[in-house]
Amino acid sequence: FLKERIKNLDITPAQLALDPCAGSCVVTDVRTGEVLALVSYPGYDGNRLANTVDAAYFESLQNDKSLPQYNYATQQSTAPGSTYKMVVATAGLSEGYITIGERIRDLGEYENISNKPKCWIYPSSHGEINVSEALRDSCNYYFYETGFRMSTGNYSTSYNAELGTSVLQKYASMFGFDETTGIEIVENSPRIADDFPVMAAIGQSNNNYTTVQLARYVTAVANSGNVYRYTLLNRVEDADGNVLMTYEPEI
C-alpha cells in the first residue's frame, strides 16, 4: 500500500524523511552544450498550477518543509569538493607548478600550513603519484601541495595566500565560474574562493557553485575547453506551429 502511494506521488519520499531528501541533476550534450535534463528533487506538478490554479495543492507546496518549489539545480550553492581538482590540475600544469611526469609523495598529513589538513586516505597514503594518478585517486595531499606551490611561487617566496588564490581564480574564470550559465530561470551567482588557497585547491575554502554551474564546467573539460552559455529553450512557435525563434547554446 505504502509503495503504491509513493509511486503515485500521493506521498513523497521527502514527506517520509527517506533519503535522499533533496538533490539535483543536470545532463548535457558535451559536444553541443545542449541541456538535455535539469532536475530538482523534490519537485511539483506544474500542470496543477497552470491556467486554473489548484489552490489546495499550491498551499500544500507553500507549507512543505522539503521546499519543492526551490530549484536545487540552480539555486543551491555548495562547495564543489574534489570535482574542482581538474581546475587546479589545469592551472598547475599551465603555470609550471607541477609537470606531467613529476611524482609527489603523499605523506598523509600536510604540514606546510598551520591547520595541517589530511588526505582523505589518512592514516594510509597514496604513495608517490603523478597528476593523472592524483586525479584518479582524488589525492588531497597532491593538491594541497599544488595550492601551496602556487602560494609561494614554487617555493621562491614566503607563503602568500593572495598569490595562490589569484592563480586559482584565473583558471576558475576560464572554466566559466565567474558568471552564471545563461539559463532563463533564477540562478544563484557562483563564488570563486578568495582565501585559503591550499584548501581551495581541493574544492573547499569558500568556493560555492550550483549543480548547473558544475555541469557547465565538466562539459568544458569533456569537450577540451568550450565553455557554453546555456539555454533551456529550443524554439518558440505560434499557434499554427510556425517557428518564430530558435535557441542554441553559445560559446
Question: How would you name each of these model-derived features?
Answer:
Residues 2, 6, 13, 17-82, ...:
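Beta-lactam-recognizing serine transpeptidase/beta-lactamase-like catalytic domain environment
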